[in-house]
Amino acid sequence: MGVQGLWKLLECSGHRVSPEALEGKVLAVDISIWLNQALKGVRDSHGNVIENAHLLTLFHRLCKLLFFRIRPIFVFDGDAPLLKKQTLAKRRQRKDSASIDSRKTTEKLLKTFLKRQALKTAFRSSRHEAPPSLTQVQRQDDIYVLPPLPEEEKHSSEEEDEKQWQARMDQKQALQEEFFHNPQAIDIESEDFSSLPPEVKHEILTDMKEFTKRRRTLFEAMPEESNDFSQYQLKGLLKKNYLNQHIENVQKEMNQQHSGQIQRQYQDEGGFLKEVESRRVVSEDTSHYILIKGIQGKKVMDVDSESLPSSSNVHSVSSNLKSSPHEKVKPEREPEAAPPSPRTLLAIQAAMLGSSSEDEPESREGRQSKERNSGATADAGSISPRTCAAIQKALDDDNDEKVSGSSDDLAEKMLLGSGLEQEEHADETAERGGGVPFDTAPLTPSVTEVKECVTSGSSANGQTDSAHSFTTASHRCDTPKETVSLARAVKEASQISSECEVEGRPAALSPAFIGTPSSHVSGVLSEREPTLAPPTTRTHSDQGIDIHPEDPELQNGLYPLETKCNSSRLSSDDETEGGQNPAPKACSTVHVPAEAMSNLENALPSNAEERGDFQETIQLREVPEAAARELISAPKPMGPMEMESEESESDGSFIEVQSVVSNSELQTESSEASTHLSEKDAEEPRETLEEGTSRDTECLLQDSSDIEAMEGHREADIDAEDMPNEWQDINLEELDALESNLLAEQNSLKAQKQQQDRIAASVTGQMFLESQELLRLFGVPYIQAPMEAEAQCAMLDLTDQTSGTITDDSDIWLFGARHVYKNFFNKNKFVEYYQYVDFYSQLGLDRNKLINLAYLLGSDYTEGIPTVGCVTAMEILNEFPGRGLDPLLKFSEWWHEAQNNKKVAENPYDTKVKKKLRKLQLTPGFPNPAVADAYLRPVVDDSRGSFLWGKPDVDKISTFCQRYFGWNRMKTDESLYPVLKHLNAHQTQLRIDSFFRLAQQEKQDAKLIKSHRLNRAVTCILRKEREEKAPELTKVTEALDDAKGKTQKRELPYKKETSVPKRRRPSGNGGFLGDPYCSESPQESSCEDGEGSSVMSARQRSAAESSKISCSDVPDLVRDPPHGRQGCVSTSSSSEDDEDKAKTVLVTARPVFGKKKLKLKSMKRRKKKT
């Protein structure tokens, strides 16, 4: 720490020094202050402590010292003196309190952080935008303020866009380089290539096309035989065509990106666009054209009841794709068939969209003629009227599919619809005599019979009794009064299988057609009861397949299979304005294998509580209006359940799964049903059955789990909506203010914690050992001081073992140091050199006065006086002069008297300084003599020994850096190589400034005292010292004169010196006076001449007459002139003799030039005379 404020007082006496000027000097280094600086000052960019900061600091500073070829001697601190231990004990208490405060601050910091996080969460939940600050609200915008950016540009980052674009360009460049090296390496069909942006793909493909066109022979050799040349040309043509196709696809993709918005907008309005194409106009750079193909508006098509639709009006029928339920076609006769088969529907879509988007658009007249021709052939019997009606319904159902349908539902609807349509068409052909007989393949019988009942509407109690509920896809039939026999169902199944065989596909059995032998058919008669529907209500009609046991074909066993309607869907959105709408009640038998039921039982919860929780209504999917739900219930032992269609009382209809069958009942029923199987059925292979049933079971379980997840999300959303918003009534401005306050508090707490950590840090013995190890590796000597390192460095300086000390601790002056280098390792400051002689002559501060300043300012041995700075301390020394501790004793005595006489009127003769000093507070026992004794007689090692320096061990230093710093060999060599290069350089030439001392330059660099109070105090101190030493000087001179007995002769030089104009000194300045007169002021020169001549005369007489006066008095006289010289500089008054001398100095120069002028005039006169 040193004496507080002492460097500020001494800065006027220091001057800059270049580090190169210190080359070859032996300097002592106080390493203790280094360790403290590294421990408390070295931090990273975030203010955190760096690991092994003391070693890192020592390493870099060692390299700097050796780079300038300085020979350092490091001094470590020893045991602290008693006074310093007391001071350290007080500091330790402050450190402990600081560590406790640091922990408390950490807790506060954590709480503040949590509060801020809670506020951020509240902001995110309450709004999406940041609240406006008060400055933004109250500020009035200037007229030149630009409008705010759009939201997209605010949230977008140019740097992120640039990074993404750079990544794309790098990927493109890599692909191009790879293609140029190996053209066969790039696969344009790969996923990586497809994921590239269209622009990049287009550019790469274009480059590939040009490359293959020009440089094909480089990577593909020409055929040796002429017969193979045609094959070579064909391969090239195919590759070119292959690239052209990809380039066209990429161009379409780019056009679609530009024109996709137009197409989406047109479709949202209800229209239909076949294709939209956008390309640039070649003649104009900024123009594009947009080609729209297949525009069809949203129109209501009214079909005449007498005319039947044909293939010529397919496009007109397709315009009802977006039409509402009120705008549906109403034919004269209700069609008796369902929508067409998938093959028929695909053919219709192909006819609507065209064979290829590349074909040029045909004219409207040509297309109408083609449609007339195709319509003539279609009327001949290719498409029946029922098929056209089914097509109309299929197109109408596309709109309903968005609400309650899915891809699986559409597939099943198309399969079922195709079977019904073809069955009706087969009946017509049979009536005309064109029927074709066909065979039906028997289906594998199922094991367990499960009755399926489908209900429309919501149940009254809203609860379900089923523990094993699952949903499947359903099919909507728009003919509620139609009754389909079992024979027709068998025909449909067989016809579907035959169609699959013709198309080359495996006959996948639809879930809607699964049959069992006729011996196990449990017929269910459908009872139809009309249900009254109130006006403006939405009715959902369900169609079930009625199985008639009275059917003669069924009784005769003509068709050995029975149909099973596996599922039915409620999707009709017809609205009735009034009247009654009869809704049929249908029930069908569902057959589920035993393995499927066992797998379902294993997948469901085992215990009763979980089963009870599992009994709930499962919503299939959410729809904005009418939502359909299905219910498939396991059969009861009593018999089949009936399916009713009820009117929906809520916004959306749903289907519930209800069952009261337990696991044991299911197992018993499955065993009973298995006993009814015939021997012939048992012998049939079951592989296909097991595969089908396992697949169906997996689908059912997966659907069940998906529905449960959807139900859970829906309940969570409902709970979130019902939950009240806790932040609704909170003012956002208050939250803003609170957040800003918390942020400011968090920053202040961080700074406070870092400061407390610095205070709590302390140097340990382990740090000393590690630092000494690093010094040994560099070959630098070090010593362990008995107590204070500063005192040991001062001792080395006093005994001339070193040329100075590198330190920033001002305590070294109090221990008697003479040369100190400061700011050597500060990059922002120059190296400053301080000498004891300089500030002794300029400020009048000797060692005793420096110790007195330590009493007043505070140091490592004393606390000092509060509110006392360097200026006030100098004023105290000026007000109470004396030697040693006399000034402080006088000051303490006066202060106690002033405190005792507070009530008495103040002394009118007191100065302003004393009036201020009355307010100070002195500690009891001030001043303590032990402090001065500790500075004047420190415990040091005064032995004189030689110091040796070695060369750095590079290998061991690299190992040390790797262990403590984590550096590799390369990084260590980067720091050591410049140092080793300078150490190994052999330089014998000396610098020019080593031969002489630039005294004039040093005087010019000397800084002036800026403070007027300090300047006045220093001037008074120097005058008083000169006055004190004047009697001593006169006593010495009188003693010398008495010994010579020539007192009168001694006065003669003073009288002769008044006639200085007659005395000339040799000078090399061409007629001007010597250097002392030119570089110094007249006062300085007069003082120097007066005192210097007396000293020189005293020396001559003492040497000539061999006086008995001791030689110890002479050095004191020699040391006195600097004080007298400085006194002459600082004081404003001087003697009359000095003024006369100054005048005579100016006069003496005139006669010299005047005589020359007289000589010149006399010479001219002589020439004229001659």
Curated annotation (Swiss-Prot):
I-domain, as annotated region: 785-880
Positions with a binding annotation for Mg(2+) 2: 809, 811, 860
EC numbers, comma separated: 3.1.-.-
Entry-linked InterPro entries: 5-3_exonuclease_C_sf, HhH2, PIN-like_dom_sf, XPG-I_dom, XPG/Rad2, XPG/Rad2_eukaryotes, XPG_CS, XPG_DNA_repair_N
Phosphoserine: modified positions: 384, 704-705
Residue window of motif Nuclear localization signal 1: 1049-1065
GO biological process terms, semicolon-separated: determination of adult lifespan; DNA repair; multicellular organism growth; nucleotide-excision repair; response to UV; UV protection
Record-listed N6-acetyllysine modification sites: 8
Region: DNA-binding, residue numbers: 31-67, 819-835, 847-879, 911-917
Cofactor note: Binds 2 magnesium ions per subunit. They probably participate in the reaction catalyzed by the enzyme. May bind an additional third magnesium ion after substrate binding.
GO function terms (MF aspect): endonuclease activity; metal ion binding; protein-containing complex binding; single-stranded DNA binding
Region spans: Spacer region: 79-784
Composition bias type Polar residues, residue spans: 455-474, 659-676, 1094-1110
Cofactor needs: Mg(2+)
Residue positions of motif Nuclear localization signal 2: 1153-1170
Gene Ontology CC terms, in alphabetical order: chromosome; nucleotide-excision repair complex
Pfam families documented for this protein: XPG_I, XPG_N
Region of interest (Interaction with ERCC6/CSB), residue spans: 1010-1170
Region of interest: Disordered: 304-479, 520-587, 600-701, 1033-1146
Compositional bias of kind Basic and acidic residues: 324-336, 363-373, 539-551, 677-698, 1041-1060
Keywords: Acetylation, Chromosome, DNA damage, DNA repair, DNA-binding, Endonuclease, Hydrolase, Magnesium, Metal-binding, Nuclease, Nucleus, Phosphoprotein
Gene3D superfamilies found in the cross-reference section: 5' to 3' exonuclease, C-terminal subdomain, 5'-nuclease
Subunit composition and interactions: Monomer. Homodimer. Component of the homologous recombination repair (HR) complex composed of ERCC5/XPG, BRCA2, PALB2, DSS1 and RAD51. Within the complex, interacts with BRCA2 and PALB2. Interacts with RNA polymerase II. Interacts (via C-terminus) with ERCC6/CSB; the interaction stimulates ERCC6/CSB binding to the DNA repair bubble and ERCC6/CSB ATPase activity. May form a complex composed of RNA polymerase II, ERCC6/CSB and ERCC5/XPG which associates with the DNA repair bubble during transcription-coupled nucleotide excision repair.
Domain notes: Both nuclear localization signals 1 and 2 act as a monopartite signal which binds to the high affinity site on KPNA2/importin-alpha.
Function: Single-stranded structure-specific DNA endonuclease involved in DNA excision repair. Makes the 3'incision in DNA nucleotide excision repair (NER). Binds and bends DNA repair bubble substrate and breaks base stacking at the single-strand/double-strand DNA junction of the DNA bubble. Plays a role in base excision repair (BER) by promoting the binding of DNA glycosylase NTHL1 to its substrate and increasing NTHL1 catalytic activity that removes oxidized pyrimidines from DNA.
Protein name stated in the entry: DNA excision repair protein ERCC-5
Gene (UniProt): Ercc5
